[in-house]
Amino acid sequence: MPELTHFDAAGQAHMVDVGGKQETRRIAIARGSIRMLPETFALIRDGNAKKGDVIGIARIAAIQGSKRTADLIPLCHPLALTRVKVDFELDDTLPGVHCTVQVETLGRTGVEMEALTAVQVGLLTVYDMCKAVDRGMTITDVRVLEKHGGKSGDWVAG
């Protein structure tokens, strides 16, 4: 079983030293969903939410979230991201919204945390903008779908 890299031999938390690693192209794709009442879904779909363009604002929030990951997750390295692509898919069968984020960098450590943070912040923004009409919304199934680059190579969720 692989070791936990954020702890030293004495069990103390530390930021991993990535100084000796090769810079490679790193890509991570994460996805999550938010379930809601059909009426809430209709407000988003039809562009009638009182706070404005829910998906447009959530997209900007997701991008901002990816860029602020190191400020939120204590042992994450601050990274110079080269690309953040955010897609929202309206799904009337949930009913709800799926958020998929692809994050890229040229660096020494992966961008999985940035992709996960972006998804969460995007979905939290949907919740924030619609909570006045639906406090029962549920954020669910947030996970990494793919990771590419680095020493460990490619990984795709099964």
Curated annotation (Swiss-Prot):
Binding site for substrate: L75, C76, H77, M113, E114
Record CDD domains: MoaC_PE
Superkingdom assignment: Bacteria
Keywords, in A-Z order: Lyase, Molybdenum cofactor biosynthesis
Family recorded in the similarity comment: Belongs to the MoaC family.
Quaternary organization: Homohexamer; trimer of dimers.
Record's protein name: Cyclic pyranopterin monophosphate synthase
Gene designation: moaC
